[in-house]
Amino acid sequence: MIPDCRSGDGKGGGRTIQKYQIIYADPPWDYQQCRLSGSAKKHYPTMRIEELCALPVAEIADRDCALFLWATFPQLPEALRLIQAWGFVYKTVAFVWLKQNRKALTWFYGLGFWTRRNAEICLLATKGHPKRQSAGIHQLVISPVERHSKKPNEVREKIVALMGDVPRIELFARQQTPGWDVWGNEVENSTALLKEG
């Protein structure tokens, strides 16, 4: 399924594609090449890189658009491939989430592959020339882990502070968020879904 971000009469007539200046995505990465391949699949359906690349995200990106893409370090090559497939150019790491335990606020450590992992990164890529609205947004996010793979809510706030209150969508969303259109299999979508084929 892919986002159908069109507005109109709902019957196919007079419809235009909704364009977004911010796209925030936390893809359900499939770790087929890794020994922990079943870990994510225990919690939610995953997608192969080919399936992710086939999503028509470029169609919903405005002329000037910022993409914020969560990636894990083992999936970094796939994340960079996905950025390009969606029509964006990699710029930097926007946010580094340093994970804490929920109760004790000590550092949380996952299993990792070579070293015990703690951090997760959100990459920033652009299409066109989106403008930064604030120079005071910090890269570090120190926040407790929640349910599997759920990202800190404050990241959305940082994105809006950085880029402004512009049309925005969260792909693979896990919750409704005021001011954001959402699309994903864990939320009631604010956009219609269009099936391929």
Where are the predicted features?
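Class I S-adenosyl-L-methionine-dependent methyltransferase catalytic core
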Residues: 1-197
